């Protein structure tokens, strides 16, 4: 038992290490369950955390008037981060605006149990989502995005570029 404890400790530490993201996933439209972006010039992708391997890190849902996409990175412990998109009026491939006028928005949060920074698109800080695949039969949604979002705490805005997603809609 004494020999097993150090081995388990090392395995736990290895499993909970953050993986550096060296490149974004390729933009695809096959339901590959991928997501990535550059947040203020730093690459971001969903990641699990060793002690929470079953937590959902990427999900999408159709809603009556659009779609919601969530992507989470739990591996940056103690700070975790998340994207949420609510895109209204999705009716196939096309360009959709992220602003407060149409009800569509992008939201990005960093938190240590409670939020330490929150940003959301609005009438002044906007962006777009370009949906390239919207296959309701196969339940695949794919596309690209970019936006600048205002801080809800009065901090500097966040700039998100080179975004891409390819998700299976639940």
Locate each region found by the language model.
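Sec-dependent bacterial lipoprotein signal peptides
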Residues: 1-17
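Long, charged/polar, soluble alpha-helical segments
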Residues: 32-34, 54, 168
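C-terminal or internal capping secondary-structure element at the end of a domain, subdomain, or sheet
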Residues: 127-170
């Amino acid at each position: 038992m004494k020999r097993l404890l150090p081995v388990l400790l090392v395995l736990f530490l290895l499993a909970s290490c953050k993986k550096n993201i060296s490149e974004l996933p390729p933009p695809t439209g096959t339901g590959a369950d991928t997501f990535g972006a550059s947040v203020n010039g730093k690459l971001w992708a969903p990641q699990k955390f060793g002690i929470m391997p079953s937590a959902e890190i990427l999900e999408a849902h159709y809603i009556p008037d659009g779609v919601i996409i969530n992507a989470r990175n739990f591996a940056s412990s103690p700070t975790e981060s998340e994207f949420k998109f609510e895109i209204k009026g999705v009716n196939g491939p096309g360009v959709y605006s992220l602003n407060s006028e149409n009800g569509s928005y992008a939201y990005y949060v960093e938190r240590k149990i409670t939020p330490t920074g929150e940003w959301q698109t609005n009438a002044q800080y906007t962006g777009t989502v370009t949906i390239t695949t919207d296959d309701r039969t196969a339940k695949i949604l794919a596309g690209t995005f970019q936006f600048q979002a205002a801080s809800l705490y009065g901090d500097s805005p966040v700039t998100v570029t080179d975004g891409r997603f390819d998700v299976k809609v639940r």
